[in-house]
Amino acid sequence: MEILIKNKRANFDYEIIDRFTAGIVLLGWEVKSIQAKNISLVGAFCYFKGHELFLSNAKISEYKGSRGQTDRSRKLLMHKHELKKILKEKITRKLAIIPLFIGQKNRKIKLEIALAKGKTKLDKRNLIKERDQKREAAKFLKNYY
């Protein structure tokens, strides 16, 4: 799958537990805008309405000369057994459903979603500390040898 747009905050704010691929119901101008990479997934999330899954807060910029709602909810297309599994995990383990990236597979726009658990501020601080320590160790070893 060719990745078009990534949710850059997903791996920093959440601990990814499971991944799924879903299709998205889009309008023509939305497809063109996504292919031109005019979309933001930061702050986007998925929610259940009945037995259907929807993507919310994904902002697709208007394509040239088109008019429409840029931040409407979009239905996600998945098999029923996948939806049941996601709903069961979400309820029992109290997980969030977040979009990871939008890609193109066989000229069709696909969304990679994940069941994720939110990280605390302490977890994020520790992650930053570990990253800095690794960077400094690599820098020291580079200068040492």
Swiss-Prot record:
GO biological processes: trans-translation
InterPro entries per UniProt: SmpB, SsrA-bd_prot, SsrA-bd_prot_CS
GO cellular component, one term: cytosol
Classification via Pfam families: SmpB
This protein's UniProt keywords: Cytoplasm, RNA-binding
MF terms in GO: RNA binding
UniProt subcellular location: Cytoplasm
Record-stated family: Belongs to the SmpB family.
Function: Required for rescue of stalled ribosomes mediated by trans-translation. Binds to transfer-messenger RNA (tmRNA), required for stable association of tmRNA with ribosomes. tmRNA and SmpB together mimic tRNA shape, replacing the anticodon stem-loop with SmpB. tmRNA is encoded by the ssrA gene; the 2 termini fold to resemble tRNA(Ala) and it encodes a 'tag peptide', a short internal open reading frame. During trans-translation Ala-aminoacylated tmRNA acts like a tRNA, entering the A-site of stalled ribosomes, displacing the stalled mRNA.
Protein's name according to its UniProt entry: SsrA-binding protein
Lineage of producing organism: Bacteria, Bacillati, Mycoplasmatota, Mycoplasmoidales, Metamycoplasmataceae
